[in-house]
Amino acid sequence: MNIEGLAARDGLLFFGFRGPAKDERAPILSTKADELFKAEAPKADVTFIEVGKGRGIRALARVNDGILVLAGPDDDLANQDVGWILGLWDGKPADVAKLKYAAKPDLSAVKLRKCDDELKPEALAVLRDEPDAYDVIIMSDGMCDGGPLKFTLQRK
């Protein structure tokens, strides 16, 4: 089990998992933040987000109308070429949920420098949350300065 994303919204904490992903879905666990500090075990909901074959959660970020989800290759080496997707989940518990506005960030123009090992998006920060689009920064493990890349996710 590998927690990769964390977001807080409306008194809840959301934990995104890179693995185990199953049937093209990755789990996000949500629980009331204040219940984590009580003596009894917290109640939690698990929602499986449809992220596609070979992907798990890489990062989560709160926005006004839900949770942005960055998903990318899971831990199976056979899945390293599946690419990344970014989309919106409304944050409502369900057995299975689909991402809205899902898009694949275009990473083709990124050139590795001498100090970079690899491009591996792992972090997400929201710069702008407007009715027409989200502007985000995606940061990468394996790049000497985090390799910040700006993307716009259009709301359709």
PLM region spans:
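Sequence/structural signature of beta-propeller domains
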Residues: M1-K156
